[in-house]
């Protein structure tokens, strides 16, 4: 009985003590509640912007990424008595590419699929383009990777658009296609970084009066690292008085290294390009620097003349909806003297079945003062298809 009374008295005293303490607790204006899921995931403005850019990038990839390619098949016949093969069928080009634009960046990856494995001259399947370009501002775009050298009008042009059965000798020998210095086949490309832009819009159409491009390159062609720490500097400056006409001058200062031999590659080119109802293109280029070859003992050496030059002119005229005809005069001088001249006179006819399929026939008369058979004729038939 005493134990029960003790327990009751202790409980009553505890309640009495707790009541004043409860009254001392200040009342809260708002009750404490658990945070909601939305409040727990609230983002900062920076995080929100990054998420928005990420979503936009994904959308750009879906909408702007393009896969494609083209094939050029060729049949060639000639009457050159010094040639071991006077007729030949081959795949001139097979190209596969992916390109697109994400946010302010344009990109391209292009592979050349035809050729021969482990070809020492670079004519094997290979990466030809792998670049990305920041295009935030029209007057200053920065490109990085492997891409066309900024030299001559014709070099950056697609084989579909040059208007003949092949690039001019000027482009081939002096712009890095199959360069005279002995560089492996590089399709006019090198690895580096380039700044280019357009500015000063004029006229009713507001076309830009000026365009510039300047690049720093390894100087060794595609898929090759720098060999001596000296870079090639290549640039061009364009004036466009009317939308259809461009006038330009190009410069190249660099060198090339192979087998422990270094030769200069200092070049200047200038020309014009008109794209209207007809197409006209003409360029001249000169080069200072020897070639890399072998001496009388078969050892690597700088050989050949220290200078060369080349020029060409081409005109294209459409006839009706499907036909286009071209005429081209094409000259290369390996030592800048007439005794080293190789001249080509071309007539070309193209028939477009539709925009992605055409057949092209070219007749060429060649006068080569350095060859055994100095004068010969060539007929070239090519089929172009792209997808």
Mark where each language-model region is.
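Sequence/structural signature of outer-membrane beta-barrel proteins
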Residues: 74-81, 112-118, 151, 202, ...
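Outer-membrane beta-barrel "beta-signal"
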Residues: 351, 375-387
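Detector for outer-membrane/organellar transmembrane beta-barrel domains
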Residues: 238-335
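N-terminal periplasmic/intermembrane-space "pro-region" immediately following the signal or transit peptide
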Residues: 5, 17-72, 387
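Hydrophobic h-region of N-terminal signal peptides that target proteins for export
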Residues: 10-17
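C-terminal hydrophobic structural anchor segments
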Residues: 316-367
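Outer membrane beta-barrel
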Residues: 54-219, 227-234, 238-247, 314-317, ...
